[in-house]
């Protein structure tokens, strides 16, 4: 049965208009984005099938075009839509984070970092630069590449903080497909960076390690110098 034959109150678009987006399931929201299904499968049925295949909305939205194209009804158009949705969501979240008066809640930072870094396929490092009131000034990418290629120079982070007139900063990097547990190299790097930042009166508040499923805070683990 096509969605047009459903009772009006159960159709995803009508349901959204009547009850709001929060009332819709992941499959219903995805169906609105997909717009159409395939032969013998409504958009909602296709959405449910894709969610089951990929395991979560996040994994589906971040799937590579080649993997999406293996499913009937999916391809470059769907990949483009998903990429746009993710980027819009990331930018909205970044705006909300930047407009926050004070970043006193580590969970807010963790949520942003999970969204920003959690689905990256390579290791990416970023710095969150803050003013004296812990208000976000800017988010800057420090490096991108494989683990072997992902070299971060402490002097560059110091220069970045000074150029942005930051009073403090938070750094983060992801472990693609790995554990959020910090390595000995991560711990030693954090200590050296904290020492270097203290020489220019900039505080290193925390170091986060991000995976698609979790976020690890050095401060919460008692690893900050």
Curated annotation (Swiss-Prot):
Keywords: Hydrolase, Metal-binding, Metalloprotease, Protease, Zinc. Signal peptide: none annotated. GO terms for biological process: proteolysis. It holds the Pfam family RadC. InterPro entries: MPN, RadC_JAB, RuvA_2-like, UPF0758, UPF0758_N. SUPFAM superfamilies: JAB1/MPN domain (SSF102712), RuvA domain 2-like (SSF47781). Zn(2+) binds at residues 173, 175, 186. A motif (JAMM motif) lies at residues 173-186. CDD domains: MPN_DUF2466. NCBIfam families: PRK00024.1 (NF000642), radc (TIGR00608). This is UPF0758 protein NMB1038. It comes from Neisseria meningitidis serogroup B (strain ATCC BAA-335 / MC58).
């Amino acid at each position: 049965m096509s969605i047009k034959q459903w009772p009006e109150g159960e159709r995803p678009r009508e349901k959204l208009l009547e009850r709001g987006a929060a009332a819709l399931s992941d499959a219903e929201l995805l169906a609105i984005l997909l717009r159409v299904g395939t032969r013998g499968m409504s958009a909602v049925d296709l959405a449910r099938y894709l969610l089951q295949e990929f395991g979560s909305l996040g994994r589906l939205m971040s799937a590579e075009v080649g993997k999406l194209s293996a499913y009937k009804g999916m391809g470059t158009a769907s990949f483009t839509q998903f990429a746009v949705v993710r980027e819009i969501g990331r930018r909205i979240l970044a705006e909300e984070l930047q407009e926050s008066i004070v970043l006193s809640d580590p969970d807010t930072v963790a949520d942003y970092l999970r969204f920003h870094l959690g689905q990256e396929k390579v290791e990416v490092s970023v710095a969150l630069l803050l003013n004296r009131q812990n208000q976000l000034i800017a988010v800057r990418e420090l490096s991108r590449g494989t683990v072997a290629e992902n070299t971060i120079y402490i002097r560059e982070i110091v220069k970045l903080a000074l150029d942005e007139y930051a009073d403090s900063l938070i750094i983060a990097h992801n472990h693609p497909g790995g554990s959020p547990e910090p390595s000995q190299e991560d711990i030693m790097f954090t200590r050296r960076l904290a020492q270097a930042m203290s020489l220019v009166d900039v505080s290193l508040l925390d170091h986060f390690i991000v995976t698609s499923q979790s976020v690890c805070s050095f401060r919460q683990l008692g690893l900050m110098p």
